[in-house]
Amino acid sequence: MEKITPPADAEDILTIGAIDNMGVNAAFSSIGNTADGRIKPDVMAMGVHSAVIGVDGGTAFANGTSFASPIFCGLVACLWQACPWLTVRQLIQVVHEASDRNAYPDNIYGYGVTDMWKAYQLAMKLKADTDGK
């Protein structure tokens, strides 16, 4: 059975898998839970035929989780900037809950593709619930 390996298996981090524009897992994207059974990858992002800046400064297209991860990292950075009260664990929680496979995560797609608007709304609800206590 395949396992996600270090450093992607660390706790309290988001591990990002790569999908294509049809939402299909990329053949090069690691699969498998962690050695202690946690779901990894956490979520998926575009990593096949991703638009990147080429060596000539123009647009190029490339494949890899090395592209999926920074694409998703940028989205999460925007979410955290909008919701700076979130702890790391709360941030991961809203990302998981806002993903399309949240109800049935697996060791290929994790929690799936995240709807960042939904993640923002969940973060705002979490703040309202916390402020109301």
Task: Walk through the language-model features, giving the residues of each.
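N-terminal low-complexity, intrinsically disordered patches enriched in charged
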Residues: 26, 73, 119-121
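Generic alpha-helical structural context detector
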Residues: 14, 41, 77, 93-96, ...
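Hydrolase catalytic cores
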Residues: 3, 47-109, 113
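Secreted peptidase-domain scaffold signal
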Residues: 118-133
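Catalytic-core segments of hydrolase enzymes
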Residues: 1-54, 96-99
